[in-house]
């Protein structure tokens, strides 16, 4: 088998100079389901449990969230865009990720999905009210599909800087002095999840929620065994959407890796990063620009060690673009920026990580010694 040929002298193909010149080989995963149950419109919010809501709120404000609602037991965070909240944090004994909630395109989709899986529809106590159906993906992660009755109104934006570019000067007799303040979050962009059952979990999101793949990554020398990472977007037809709303990758763990939140521009990322650093928070990796998705990025750890990303200027794809295919490597994570850190890759050795690997290798899943060695090679290449 050989790669799909690309004619450098002809018109651009969907993979030439767009996101990957390598399309699928014959018989490889198509990256979408023919007849999904529904097609979700976007991520709605992410749900966490934490013991200290006061500390969580301090970080949230420093990171750039606005507070949508606060009770003794719940903290709802939001961005400036109109719509649903970005995050729900419930008070609990331990810090843990509870799962994502996806936004249904219309209320009838919640009922249709509930009927298809045999689950009930329930009211949800979200600002503005709404309805939801609760599911589990093949990894065992709780997933909700929701429809909010009343969207939150928009909040004031952090305006982008007016830039002088080449022969198009737009700013004269004025200086650039962006204030040292939090990067004002606009919206939730995506969540990245790790799973030991990559193939089954991927197919579940495509079959059940109607999502489609933008890019596949595969391990060196193991392409014939299928991909080990997928960047997945929502299918809204001709309407351009984020390159990925969800990313899945094979690994020894199960659950949350990081989540990403859009801000105005590069200066908002940089100044917000300075603000976080001055307050003693840990940068995990950044600032740089990704390859898959093209986002400008900056990754930070919250006080509970969860990783969150500020991003701007990401790719937008319509439903027409077919998946790209590329080898997985640490050096392939960014077009430019500082070297990727061990903290970001999760490769720092620890007793907990060793137990996680041993448990995965003994279990009935897709992580075998060859896959593990391939992942280790990718993270060092």
PLM regions with names:
Residues 1-34, 41-51, 91-115, 118-184, 230-231, 280-381, ...:
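Vicinal oxygen chelate
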Residues 199-288, 295, 303-304:
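Structured core of small recognition/catalytic domains
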Residues 77-82, 91, 135-138, 232-236, ...:
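Active-site beta-strand termini and strand-to-loop segments that position acidic
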Residues 2-17, 38-84, 193-241:
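Core segments of cupin and vicinal oxygen chelate
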Residues 32-35, 87-88, 177-180, 244-249:
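Short beta-strand/turn micro-motifs at beta-sheet edges
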Residues 26-120, 124, 129, 365-381:
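The feature marks the first
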Residues 153, 161-206, 216-218, 224:
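Non-heme Fe(II) oxygenase catalytic core, chiefly the N-lobe of the double-stranded beta-helix
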């Amino acid at each position: 088998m050989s790669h799909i040929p690309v004619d450098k002298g002809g018109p651009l193909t969907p993979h030439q100079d767009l996101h990957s010149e390598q399309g699928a080989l014959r018989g490889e995963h198509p990256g979408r389901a023919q007849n999904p149950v529904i097609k979700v419109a976007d991520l709605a919010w992410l749900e966490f449990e934490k013991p200290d809501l006061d500390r969580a709120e301090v970080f949230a404000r420093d990171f750039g969230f606005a507070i949508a609602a606060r009770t003794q037991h719940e903290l709802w965070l939001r961005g400036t865009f109109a719509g649903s909240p970005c995050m729900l944090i419930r008070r609990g004994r331990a810090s843990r990720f509870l799962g994502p909630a996806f936004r249904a395109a219309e209320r009838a989709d919640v009922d249709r999905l509930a009927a298809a899986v045999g689950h009930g529809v329930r009211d949800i106590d979200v600002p503005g009210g709404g309805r939801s159906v609760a599911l589990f993906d093949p990894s065992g992660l709780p997933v909700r599909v929701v429809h909010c009755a009343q969207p939150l109104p928009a909040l004031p934006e952090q305006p982008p800087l007016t830039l002088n570019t080449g022969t198009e000067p737009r700013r004269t007799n004025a200086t650039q002095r962006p204030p040292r303040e939090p990067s004002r979050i606009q919206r939730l962009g995506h969540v990245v999840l790790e799973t030991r059952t990559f193939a089954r979990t991927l197919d579940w999101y495509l079959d059940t929620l109607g999502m489609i793949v933008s890019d596949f990554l595969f391990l060196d020398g193991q392409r014939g065994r299928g991909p080990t990472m997928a960047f997945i977007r929502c299918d809204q037809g001709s309407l351009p959407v984020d390159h990925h709303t969800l990313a899945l990758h094979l690994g020894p763990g199960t659950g949350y890796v990081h989540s990403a939140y859009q801000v105005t521009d590069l200066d908002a990322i940089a100044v917000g990063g300075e603000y976080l650093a001055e307050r003693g928070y840990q940068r995990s990796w950044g600032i740089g620009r990704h390859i898959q998705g093209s986002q400008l990025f900056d990754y930070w750890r919250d006080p509970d060690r969860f990783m969150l990303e500020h991003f701007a200027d990401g790719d937008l794809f319509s439903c027409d673009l077919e998946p790209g295919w590329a080898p997985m490597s640490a050096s392939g994570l960014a077009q430019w920026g500082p070297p990727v850190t061990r903290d970001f890759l999760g490769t720092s050795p620890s007793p907990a990580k060793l137990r996680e690997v041993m448990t995965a290798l003994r279990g009935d899943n897709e992580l075998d010694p060859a896959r593990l060695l391939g992942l280790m090679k990718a993270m060092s290449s």
